Amino acid sequence: MTKKTAHIISHTHWDREWYMPYEYHHALLIELMDTLLDTLDNDPGFKSFHLDGQTIMLEDYLQVRPEMKEKLTKYIQEGRIHIGPWYILQDEFLTSSEANVRNMQIGHRDAKQYGGNISKVGYFPDSFGNMGQAPQILKQSGIDVAVFGRGVKPTGFNNQVSEDAAYESPFSEMIWESPDGSRVIGILFANWYCNGMEVPVDEPQAVAYWDKQIPNAEKFASTRHLLFMNGCDHQPIQTDLSKAIEVAKKLFPDVDFVHSNFNDYVDELRKELPENLQTVHGELRSQRTDGWYTLVNTASSRVYLKQMNAENQTLLEKVAEPLAAIAHQAGKPYPHHLFVYAWKTLMQNHPHDSICGCSVDEVHREMVTRFEKSKHTTETIINETVDSLLKQIDTSVYSGKQAVPFTVFNSTGYNRDGVVEVTLELSRRYFREAHPMKLAAEMKKDPIVPGAVVDADGNVLDCEWEDAGVVFGYDLPKDKFRQPYMARAVKVRLQVQDIPAFGYKTLAWVTGASKEQGASLVTGEFTLENDRLKAVVTEDGSLTLTDKSTGHTHAGLNVYEDAGDIGNEYMFRMPAGSKPLTTAGLKAERKVVENTPFRAVIEVAHNWNIPVSADDKLEEERRDIVDFNIRKAQRSTELVTFRIITRYTLDRGAKRVDVHVTMDNKSKDHRVRALFPSGFESETHLAESIFEAARRNNIPAKEWENPSNDQHQHTFVSVSDGKLGLTVANKGLFEYEVSQDNKNTIAVTLLRSSGELGDWGYFPTPEAQCIGVHTAEYAIIPHEGDVVESGAYAEAHAFQVPWVVRQVEVQEGKFPVNHAFLAWNGEGVAFSSLKMAEETGNMVGRWFNFKHEEAALNVSLPEAAKGFYRSNIMEEVQENIASTNNREVSVALSSAEIFSLGIQK
């Protein structure tokens, strides 16, 4: 009889920060790594150690122990320490598509510094669910096996019959297939990643240990190769493991115990995997469970962190990188070093215990600083890049006209219309001329001569303007000391159209020119209207929205809901028998606060009395560590005013209504959502996830017991009956639910307050109550068809990205007054990134196909390139793509494909 093999893999799962602040864990990491190196030095029987799939552990260790790099590198090159493939162990759903890619890229790049011995295992040990496109991302990274701890329901061959092939497997080994058809071997930690920890050396204890652990592993294993993970969260090195393995071999001669690693384990596993392995498909979010321990509500814990993260990602991916790639074509060096620093600083906030908001308060305070550091670096890149581009634009067409030109950049990746604002300096006087107080006084006497905006063809454009007074500014020359000044300024607002993707248009403010402004967008009492939409704000502050292109009207949009929450940072739980409160029927204060031909805003104020907190029972249950889903606490009978200020904005020509919410939160232990009844009959909906629009069921599986069915989203969630649709776009609001009512109501979480971490102990988190002023931004987009067919996804994506509008000198230059550096089109195709590849120096653009059928992507350049090639997400050359003129290329994207195009300039 062939012996079973027990593969014992030593590891530790290293949460950089969690129930203790980062530096507490950091000190423990130094101790662990010192012990590991000492063990490797002194015990040749201690074969290897898996460093949790994340290279940042090396960075953190060497920050304090730089003298150990040589020894560390030696053991990595010898294969005794296994590193990578990631930089950090991210939460997949709360970080962007590109962030997941950059995590892989940086992990590989950093691993090469230690000899390039990278562990080619897609390692997701503790992710709170797994992204559907992971197999495609892994395959494009040269990885064909994934190891994960959550998302699939293990049934066990001798336990029960699988009922859902998509999300269940009788074995811990399976095939995992992404929407494009990419397939990897999936290995589930069916007995978690600690089923081989603390192996006893004492013989009687060892017998009892292995008599339990071996059958538990056999229950789910499809082969005779059994996986035992020798470690757990922050688990110290088991320094006597060699001896423990020798004891096990003596006691269990029918089992071959080996101190293994993932490479060896997977190699042996491949040889014996049965042909009838279950295939699981797409997202693995524990769909076939009772719904209580999915940890999905980390998406709404400390919403402010998610908003800061979304803003940082957008600035990096959709502003800084495309503009820097464009500027590189114009001769400016691409700042790889600054981008790596900005990305790494941002990614240090991406581990699941960090970005999920499920740690102690000290952790999340430090995260805010990291977000600000990354953002400031990114904004520096943007400013330097835009200044470089501005200096090369030929604006001489505006010479001799007393013109003040300005350039409108579009880095969204889609052709763009919209309303923009810019403050223009009509004149400057530097401090070297006189005291700034004198300069300001003199300049205030200069009147602003009325004017208008003109384009390069001399057409006068409708605009509005206001005197912006005298403003302070400064130059930072590259060759001299700072130059402060005062400037006489005017603020201009106008509608721009057809700003090309990856391009710009240059317009100019010209004094003396004029054009009659268009009609107001306020067309009735508390009514906003443009040529596409009509929005009426009702007495309770909700919105009645009519799409003029279809004639369809949605009523009752943006009612607010407040529910008690006796859960924790991980999970929302409404008190038993409790019902949510809503603002439906609650009279609101309404007023028009902005009324112009380009933008109109109605402000709504609710003074809403809600419970001040949960009752005293909750704190008692927290201290007694009562599991959240059996708690008895209720909401307090004491009320406090929760003031919400809502600003509905409609721009000229807009396809959406923008909503800005300010909440003064004085209440604890609750959740606030905005409700959007779609009114469409459908059993499913679409939500943007990692490189896909994931189609999800409105009603959960029969095993689901949790009254809530909250889900993750990225930039939008959408309901459609096939003919019409309603999409809600958001900025950093990652939690939603399509309610199980007869209206398929989209509920988007704006705020959640909780007072404890949860999980395995009592860790108070008073700052997670989010007391104080908080904001939220989202947009309501009605459309024909679904969000992909209609192209509404592009509107949702553009909603994320700020306009970049800057004043430029009248000058001669290399580039025309209006220009596009790259143009593309593709129905159902979404833009992801445009950047310069670190290794090749080539430009790489990335797109993905939202459709589950083939889509055509067409890309063109204004000037010929040296060549085009298909790349992967690692930005490696895969195959050349033919082009008849080296300016244009057409590519057929397969269903749900992530496609990277390399451009050799």
Per-range role (PLM):
Residues 1-98, 102-103, 110-114, 140, ...:
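N-terminal catalytic cores of secreted or lumenal carbohydrate-active enzymes
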